[in-house]
From Swiss-Prot:
This is Transcription factor SOX-1. Residues 51-119 bind DNA. The keyword Membrane does not apply. The gene is SOX1. Residues 224-240 have a biased composition (Basic residues). The lineage of its organism: Eukaryota, Metazoa, Chordata, Craniata, Vertebrata.
Amino acid sequence: MYSMMMETDLHSPGGAQAPTNLSGPAGAGGGGGGGGGGGGGGGAKANQDRVKRPMNAFMVWSRGQRRKMAQENPKMHNSEISKRLGAEWKVMSEAEKRPFIDEAKRLRALHMKEHPDYKYRPRRKTKTLLKKDKYSLAGGLLAAGAGGGGAAVAMGVGVGVGAAAVGQRLESPGGAAGGGYAHVNGWANGAYPGSVAAAAAAAAMMQEAQLAYGQHPGAGGAHPHAHPAHPHPHHPHAHPHNPQPMHRYDMGALQYSPISNSQGYMSASPSGYGGLPYGAAAAAAAAAGGAHQNSAVAAAAAAAAASSGALGALGSLVKSEPSGSPPAPAHSRAPCPGDLREMISMYLPAGEGGDPAAAAAAAAQSRLHSLPQHYQGAGAGVNGTVPLTHI
């Protein structure tokens, strides 16, 4: 049915219709809306020297029909009017289209007479660029810690620092001598601030992370100075998809300390995910929620972070464990908060099984005092990081 219109357009000096006045039903909104060739008053005022193309048969017919349909349906959108006009034009017979085809030929001949050297120059449509500010907030908050952990949070990786730490170790297994803990653990070189102001900022970020995210040891709570905006709630409910390999490597990174240097990555990995998080996570969650009197440990962690470059938080969450402890069989399901006390007593050593909360507090406090002294004495590494001299 478009054969006659296509003939009309092909024989015209300009070729096909303008982008807004396409031949056929798609162009019903272009030329008829403003009264044919005089439509688009703003564009005509801006481009007075621009010559418009002659209307085809459909444009001639739809000019009057569009006005009539708009008066009958004032709330109908112009695109819907165009669809209806196009469908109506398709079902019209050739005899009904004939007068409009003749009118289109007359208009084309008149246009050729008035503009003999006319050549159609299509206007390029400007493509709307998509705004790429999805991760502007995360990128702004993680500008200081621009290492692997920041990239992991920006990409939305569920396990956070664990994924970044695994990636760093897989990519550069021998890079620990040059970069220290910064490259082994996936943190940036500036993650251990040397100045007092940076230490105070790290302590404030740590406290904010404790209050907001409930001390997640695997992804958010262990490194609060590098991930203040990591959206993980509490550890038992945050990972129903069982991301065990990532956190095993992450716990290995946390156990890489002089307290447990006899246990390497291999001995820490089997017991890391099952044994380590629950002892530290339950104590930290109980301290944050006010379940017992361990709130002094959080204050001591903040003070140690301000004095020794935010290393107290690492010490409070490092929980050394015998290498023979099995992984947690109950981690395939999300335990209720009431089961935390049983889990603590299950994974604590035998001497500390009497009072799990007091035992966890004592263990965390002892590590708070031991770890910062070691790192203060050995803090002569590259860029303020700690050399791995105790391997």
